[in-house]
Swiss-Prot record:
Cysteines joined through disulfide linkages: none
Name of the gene: glyQ
Pfam family for this entry, one: tRNA-synt_2e
UniProt record similarity statement: Belongs to the class-II aminoacyl-tRNA synthetase family.
Enzyme type, top EC level: ligase
Protein name: Glycine--tRNA ligase alpha subunit
Amino acid sequence: MTIEIPAHMHPSRSFQGLILTLHNYWAAYGCVILQPYDMEVGAGTFHPATTLRALGPKRWNAAYVQPSRRPKDGRYGENPNRLQHYYQYQVILKPNPPNLQELYLGSLAAIGVDPLLHDIRFVEDDWESPTLGAWGLGWECWCDGMEVSQFTYFQQVCGIECAPVAGELTYGLERLAMYVQGVDNVYDLNFNGREGADKVTYGDVFLQAEQEYSRHNFEYADTAMLLRHFEDAEAECKALLDAGAPASNDNLPMHKMVFPAYDQCIKASHVFNLLDARGVISVTERQSYILRVRNLAKACGEAFLKTQAGGLAA
């Protein structure tokens, strides 16, 4: 699966070249190469291409980059490897192929990490997302002592059993790029692969935003407004699920509003994360908010199974 790219776009020289190489690798395998979901999410798993498409019996192979926001992880741009906004590369393969680990190692080789030359270890680490009601059997992948990615066999999503089981690969792009480029500070990553006056670094692109969003997340986000937004998103999700529910006299009991409803679930999750970063949610309240988001996700997952994409026969 070798595809020639310009020298300056080699993963060892370019952050965007790393992404392009993974796109080419998984496209050659047969994945649909999707675009990032256009909403604030905490991880690539929240993309409906994973959360919803992991459910039901239909085959689904997809790969995409997903900008991810974790407000509490912001460090005002002062930490060399901790960010409140970062990028994940997500691969979802359903049904799970028997050679998932082999495929993953092949993708590492494609970006210049030869498993024969590096200490590649798989450390058991079962994955769970409380807000999505999801969990799976999983392993962290460590390369020369540093975690670079994780792969998971989904058992449940939205509180619903996955049948068939889907395989998920999640690459931490910044961390992987730091390893491949040999730099210790994420902001020093070469973004475009050029040198001299034409060179653009990760810091050139993102440092100012990281500083400003850290201030926003920890100091300035309006908590009263966010509390209202959470209530609104929760109510709208439920209203859309009710509006799209099949009527009792429908010949085919198909749900008609799953994706708009799931968008509201995503919004509620991000607002919760902002409230958590602002420190206005107690330990007891935190569990309550997580349960409320999980209930929305579960309802969206159940509705998805009543659609053609979810396996309902037309």
